[in-house]
């Protein structure tokens, strides 16, 4: 059994849970502890089953509650050295993870985390550091790519390998261009170290997906500069225009910003 659920995806808070029958891991903990407890109770999960926390980067919407979970449940926190330092310097993280539960990861170096084999890889973003994760369980490859400034060659290879993929589709280019954000913020989002547009996400998928890919989740949609239906239609149009080979056919969903999605079985 290998399952996945999104508990929040967007600037209001990001948190994802991957689990097997023996326990699971959280990817980012950017939602409040009361919200996390409520969601776990709703789905019949136990916070005592969380064996690891993987952190992508040190922005508040990804790490706000990482120290609370680590302290209260004795959960080790995996992140790069720069991200660990960023967490300790982030005033939004009021409770810091215990030093004895810090685990340092190095991009490109695989490690075991409970039942899972995990490989972090670099993703360009304007944080202290940022990584995606390739997570393998029983031969199934799950990849997480969030807060993506642009798609690198290394990321393209992981897209090609993935059976299941979470990838950012943050903004619609026209909505951002015509929206109320100041010029400096618009440039920060779109300059290659900010976030990934719907069009860039769709292009990466139709260009690099293989027959291995079974399902995609579009994550971290902007509330101001995107809409779930726009993200969906952009990918659907790209798939039609590319005329994908018949052996490549994957499902996809758009993850909700503030409420959990359904539990997906990864088979």
Predicted regions and their residues:
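Active-site neighborhood of phospho(di)ester-bond hydrolases with catalytic His/Asp-centered motifs
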Residues: 27-30, 51-58, 78-81, 143-146, ...
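Conserved beta-strand hairpin/beta-sheet module of binuclear metal-dependent hydrolase folds
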Residues: 1-43, 131-147, 164
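Cap/insert and terminal regions of metallo-dependent hydrolase folds
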Residues: 153-252
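Metal-dependent catalytic neighborhoods of phosphoester/phosphodiester hydrolases
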Residues: 64-73, 89-91, 226-233
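Metallo-beta-lactamase
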Residues: 81-132, 137-139
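Structured catalytic core of nucleotide-sugar glycosyltransferases
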Residues: 5-16, 58-66, 120
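Active-site metal-binding motif and surrounding structural segment of the metallo-beta-lactamase
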Residues: 33-80
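Active-site environment of divalent metal-dependent phosphoester hydrolases
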Residues: 12, 59-63, 85-86, 128, ...
């Amino acid at each position: 059994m290998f399952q996945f659920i999104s508990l929040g995806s967007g600037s209001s808070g990001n948190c994802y849970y991957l689990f097997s029958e023996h326990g699971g891991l959280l990817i980012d903990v950017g939602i409040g502890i009361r919200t996390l407890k409520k969601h776990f109770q709703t789905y019949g999960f136990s916070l005592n089953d969380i064996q690891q926390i993987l952190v992508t980067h040190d922005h508040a919407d990804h790490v706000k509650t990482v120290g609370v979970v680590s302290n209260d449940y004795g959960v080790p926190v995996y992140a790069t050295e720069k991200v660990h330092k960023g967490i300790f310097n982030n005033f939004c993280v009021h409770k810091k993870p215990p030093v004895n539960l810090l685990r340092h990861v190095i991009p490109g170096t695989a490690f075991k985390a409970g039942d899972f084999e995990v490989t972090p890889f670099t993703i360009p973003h304007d944080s202290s550091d940022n990584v995606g994760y390739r997570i393998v369980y029983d031969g199934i490859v799950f990849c997480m790519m969030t807060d993506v400034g642009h798609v690198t060659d290394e990321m393209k290879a992981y897209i090609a390998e993935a059976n299941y993929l979470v990838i950012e589709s943050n903004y619609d280019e026209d909505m951002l261009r015509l929206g109320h954000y100041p010029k400096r913020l618009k440039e920060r989002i779109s300059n290659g170290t900010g976030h990934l547009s719907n069009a860039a996400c769709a292009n990466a998928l139709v260009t690099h997906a293989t027959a291995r890919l079974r399902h995609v989740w579009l994550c971290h949609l902007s509330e101001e500069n995107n809409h779930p239906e726009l993200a969906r239609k952009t990918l659907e149009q790209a798939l039609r225009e590319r005329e994908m080979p018949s052996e490549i056919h994957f499902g996809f969903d758009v993850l909700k910003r503030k409420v959990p999605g359904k539990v997906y079985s990864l088979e």
